[in-house]
Regions:
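Sec-dependent bacterial lipoprotein signal peptides
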Residues: 1-28
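Short, surface-exposed glycine/acidic/tryptophan-bearing loops
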Residues: 79-127, 141
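Surface-exposed patches in mature extracellular/periplasmic domains of secreted proteins
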Residues: 66-80, 93-104, 138-154
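Disulfide-stabilized extracellular recognition modules
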Residues: 124-172
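Hydrophobic alpha-helical segments, especially transmembrane helices
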Residues: 12-16, 65, 138
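Solvent-exposed, polar/charged alpha-helical surfaces in well-ordered, non-transmembrane soluble domains
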Residues: 54, 58-62, 76, 80-87, ...
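Bacterial Sec signal peptide processing site at the extreme N-terminus
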Residues: 23-46
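Second-shell loop/turn segments in exported
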Residues: 42-53, 65-74, 87-91, 113-119, ...
């Protein structure tokens, strides 16, 4: 009878040892890396979220090339203007007048400014799609003389829009 009692105990110990070994091995492996979400799908409806201006310029440049136009590059001065305009709109909780912004930019010596001001898009993909579908916004992205841009968003948590957008394109 002693042998019958020892066998089930031995089997139980083997199973416990196997389970412990598997658990130890599992603890040593690293989980697979999480896939990084492309910048154009990243939500900008969060505090501290910033648009990837270089990625946006690449997307707009590809669109322009498909229409026989030259690419655009991020310009630090236009980037600052876009950031300031996006913050102004978020603070006022309403989009600004594109004509007023264009006049201000032209008065500051910026050559042939074209401006998209909008609100409510949470990702670059949404904004780009919306701008392509809007004749006025599409004309801005396809401004023939544009060679540089600034693009920015500002988050307004209490606003129905949440995210305000400023895209400024200009000539050389």
């Amino acid at each position: 009878m002693t042998l019958m009692i020892e066998r089930p105990c031995l089997r139980l110990m083997r199973r416990a040892l196997a389970a412990a070994s598997l658990a130890a091995l599992a603890a040593c492996t690293t989980p697979p890396p999480r896939e990084q979400q492309p910048a154009f799908y990243r939500s900008l409806a969060l505090a501290g979220a910033r648009i990837d201006a270089e990625s946006a310029a690449g997307m707009i440049s590809a669109y322009r090339r498909n229409h026989g136009l030259p690419p655009v590059t991020v310009d630090p001065a236009l980037q600052q203007e876009a950031e300031a305009e996006a913050r102004r709109m978020a603070a006022a909780d309403r989009p600004s007048s594109a004509d007023a912004v264009k006049q201000r930019l032209a008065g500051a010596g910026i050559k042939a400014p074209a401006v998209n001001l909008s609100a409510g898009y949470h990702t670059m993909a949404e904004a780009f799609s919306g701008w392509r579908e809007s004749p006025q916004h599409n004309r801005t992205m396809l401004a023939p003389g544009a060679t540089r841009l600034g693009i920015a968003t500002a988050y307004a948590p209490g606003s129905k829009y949440k995210v305000y957008w400023a895209l400024i394109l200009a000539g050389p």
